[in-house]
Amino acid sequence: KVMESTLQGKDGSEKVYVDYYGKVLQIGEDSKEDPVQGNNVYLTIDKDLQIACYKVLEQKIAGVLVANIQNIKTFKADENTDASTIPIPIYDVYYALLNNSVIDIDHFTAADASETEQKIAAALERKQEEIFRKVDEQLTGSDTKPYKDLSEEMQGYVSYIVNDLLMDKTGILSETSIDKNDETYKAWTKDETISLQEYLTYAASQNWIDISKFSDKNTYLDSTEVYQELSAYISDYLSTDQDFSKMLYKYLLLDDEITGKQLCTVLYEQGVLSTDDEDYQNFKAGNLSAMDLMLHKISSLEITPAQLALDPCSGSVVITDPSTGETLACVSYPGYDNNRLANNMDTDYYRKLNKDLSTPFYNKATQERTAPGSTFKPVTAIAGLSEGVITDNDYIYCGGRFDKLQGAPLNCWLLSGHGALSIRDGIANSCNVFFSETAYRLGQNAEGTFNDNTAMQQLIKYANLLGLDKKSGLEISEASPQVSNELP
């Protein structure tokens, strides 16, 4: 967008006079204006480096996935869970094939659907009957349950109905109309002590429901009639809602009503994977499990991190020339082929990208705002040296963790510790304890009392001096940087 005005030239023109049939009778004298060519734009990007970075990034992310996939169904992290030890359940991988449309679930009911696809479709139909009945009980039954007393599965369905269907997708439940201080609203959102029926009935009585979104009746409807119409609308909507169906698939997998083996079979049947390889023969013969097949295919990038849209599924690489500041590579993964969106737009391709859970339209290199991690350590080093809290001759001892602040201690990536480190050693080893201690000293006063705001202001000062509070100036959409205002 930014460079378009530079590239774009000016059309030429000429005034002509024509008769009724369009025949040129006369060309206006001195009316001709020659076209003006647009200006050239010169990129600093190294094409080969850009391509290489994309490939390396994809391989690295795939490697992280493979290293963390475990043969488990679910995993729940808590506040004490070390992020570096969080596994990826293989059932999440199977579900991702459906959830991010790697597998075409619409083909399950096609005339030429395979036997495996038909079995999966039949399992979904049974599940739909079961869940629609349970949802209807919560909407219209006489024995409804408070949200907190529902099963985790039913809580997921009910939350989807309220948050996704009624609010995000249709706008029936109006965000602007809801009184967030209302006691019934709090009972639903915070205390979870009322049922779906109670909440929506109350919402109808308070005019939080926009009836024009689902009813074309011109007559006045009281709150009871509004709720009856709304309940019927919800049931009808869910019956054709693909996103809701995908939720059902998740629990079909967890209940082993459909299997990873079936989904891997469908990958071959739908042409996502090629049957012309050794893995297919081993899988077909029963010598290769569904999990091992997925690990093989992720490793070989026949199934990519972008397709699965698990965590992690994205990344970025920016390489600059330190001598000139020129950008040599600016890579966001996953990307897309923008040639298919120019001139004659490929609308099917656009829709696919727009629904892709790995968000390919979002440029991670220029728009993602996240903690910089170890790349910020040189800033801490500069601040420490400049403020005199460390010197070139000082040594800081790393025993594997930093525990001078309240709360959970911060572990170094080397749990056994690095021992005594100089500033050079601290940078070379990217030691968490060394730089935590440096930041801690930045927040101490003359008496040795620590103040976290003082430490933060010192770090912010040097981050700003180094220009980290400003955009880079790349000629593409770029998020404004935001230096943190609190300690992690």
Positions of the model-derived regions?
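Beta-lactam-recognizing serine transpeptidase/beta-lactamase-like catalytic domain environment
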Residues: 16-34, 45, 66, 70-375, ...
